[in-house]
C-alpha cells in the first residue's frame, strides 16, 4: 500500500516532521513532485487517499505562499485548524470572517507569515479578481491549487459556474503553476477540468477508486426507521453520518434517535449559522456520535474515524454516492456504507431536477447509473471502480453484501420478470407497484376485486413471494429499463420498449439478473468484512480505549478536535506496538518528531503506567 522513499528526501522529511508519516501513499510522491517542479497537474485521489497533503507539503518547500481555492468554508476552516495545530503557517479568507480577523490575515500576508492561504472561488471572481496579482506582488505566489476541481465541469456532479473563471485569471500570473485536485471524476470530467482550467501539458495522475476498507450494502427500503436502527445497533458509541433527502426527514429522524438515547445532532441549511457550527463542532469534538444531515454536510469534515455512513434514500449520482459514502473510514480502518433505496427516490430526483430546470441529458444519465448500481447483482466494489474506468482484478472483494453472501440470486430471472411484466400489461399499465403486487400475490383487496383483477390469468402467480421481495424485483426491473413509472403524485407502472420485447420473447432477457436479500440464520448477524477482521489483530482493546480517553482529555485541554491530537489509526498502532521509548514512539505511524516531543511523555505514561 505504501511506497518507501530514501530518508534524505526533503518532502519525506516534511511529511515525517509535520504529519508523522514515514512513507508516501500511492500517487502522492508523483503529485508532490509535479507541484515542487512547477508543472501543471491534475490529481484524482479518492477520499481518504491523502489528496490534501499533495499540495500542503510542497507549500513548505516552494518559496512564497500557496493559494488554495476551496468551495466550502467548513472545509477550509478544518484544514487550516489542522495545519496550524501541526505547526504549518496557514490562514483563510472568506465572507463569514469578522473584519478584524480579515485585517489580521491581510497583515500576515504582507509580513509573509503564511505558506498556505485558503480562499473560496467567489473571492477571486468578479471584483475579487485583483487578489491574485496583489498576492503575487506582495508575497509571491508559489502555486495555485484548485480543490474539489470537479466543480468546474459541466459534466461533474457538483457544477459551480464561478469555478470557470479560475483558468482565465492565471493569464496575468506567468510562471505560476496551476494544480487541480478532486476525489471523484470520470474520464469525461477529467478532460473537461483540463480544458476549463487551461492546464498546460499537465501531469495527470489517477489513483485507485477502490476503498477496500469500506463494506458496501444496499437494502431495498422496507421500514426505514427499523432498518436504520439495525445498522446503528452494530455501531454503538461509534461515529457516523446519516444522509436524508430533505430537511424535514433530517429533523424527524434526529429527534427520534435522540429520544432513544443516541448522541445525535441534525445538520442542514434550514438551521442558523450558529446552530450548524455548534452541531458540526459537537461532532468533530466527539461530544456527539451521529450527525443526521442533508448532503451539504461532510465535504470537508476531517473526522477520520467515521465508522458508518447511511444513505436513507438514494443520492442523484454515483459520483455523489462515492464522495458521501467516502466520508467513512478515512483513517483506512474498516467502515460500513449502507444505501437504503426505493424506486421512489429516483422519481423524486427527476421531479426536483425538472422543477429546477436541471433535468439535462447529462443529469438523467447520472441518475440512471445510480439506479442501476442500486439494483445490480454483483460485487459492489467492482461496480463502483469500473464506473470510474478502472479495472477490478479481485475475484471477490470480501466487503460487500454480494461477496459476503447476503444476496440470493433468483434461479430463473427471465420467467420471474415476465410474470411481473405481464401483470403490468394485464392491468392496462394504469396502476402502481403496490396494486400490481397485490394482483401477483393473489390478495383480494377491495381495489383488486372491484376492478375484476382477481379474474386475470396473472392473479396469484407469485403467491409465495413476500411483499418486500416482490417490490425489490419490481424496482430492479425499473432500474434495468424494463419498466418505467409515469405520473405524480401516484405513479403508475408502464412497459418500456425493452420490457415489451422481453414479454414477447424470453430470449431478450437472457442477460438479466435479479436478487433478493438472503434471510440471515437465526441468531447470526451480518458478516464482517475481511478488513475489519484483520485490523484488530494484535491490538490491546483496553489500551486502545485508554488512549482514546487520553486523546479526548488532551483535546479538551487544548481546545482542539480530538483528531488533531491523533487519528484512530495511530491509537491502534500504539496499542498494538506499545513503544517503550521516545525513539520508538517517533516511528509509529501518525506520530512523528513534533508530536512525539509534545505528547510523548503523556502517551508513554498511558502505555506503561508510568
Per-region residue spans from a language model:
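Gly/serine-rich nucleotide phosphate-binding loop at the start of the catalytic core
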Residues: 67
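Helicase motor core with emphasis on the C-terminal RecA-like subdomain
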Residues: 2-18, 22, 26, 30-42, ...
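Accessory DNA-binding and partner-docking regions appended to nucleic-acid-acting proteins
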Residues: 2-14, 363-364, 393-610
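Flexible coil/turn residues that form the inter-helical turn or adjacent wing/linker of helix-turn-helix
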Residues: 174, 236, 377, 429, ...
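Short, charged low-complexity linear segments at domain edges
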Residues: 360-391
